[in-house]
Amino acid sequence: MTELMRIAALFAATALAEIVGCYLPWLVLKGGRSAWLLVPAALSLALFAWLLTLHPSAAGRTYAAYGGVYIAVALIWLRVVDGVALTRWDVAGAALALGGMAVIALQPRA
């Protein structure tokens, strides 16, 4: 697996853990679902925090690069879970964000 693919997969898993951890409380607060959903939400957010520690860069650089992948994963969530069709602007924005992530994550190491 190339370095970019490994980093992208780790970022995608991190983003999914964060989105699930935030979506479940949203279901409780906005959708009237059981408060028991807060338990897996907390576990998902703990997983998110742990996954962030697996990234090889300094925390600030990791968060900056992670933002690009988060945008793409959130748009996939929008399409798959929320059932909202993506626009060309959504796709273009995600492509730009992923390009920025690649520049930050794959910069030459001194």
UniProtKB/Swiss-Prot annotation:
Q: Which GO terms describe its cellular component?
A: plasma membrane
Q: How does it sit in the membrane?
A: Multi-pass membrane protein
Annotated membrane-spanning segments are 9-29, 34-54, 66-86, 88-108
Subcellular location as annotated = Cell inner membrane
Per the UniProt entry, the disulfide pairs are none
Q: Which InterPro entries match?
A: UPF0060
Tell whether Repeat is among the UniProt keywords. no
Q: Which NCBIfam families match?
A: PRK02237.1 (NF002586)
**Protein name in the entry:** UPF0060 membrane protein Bcenmc03_1254
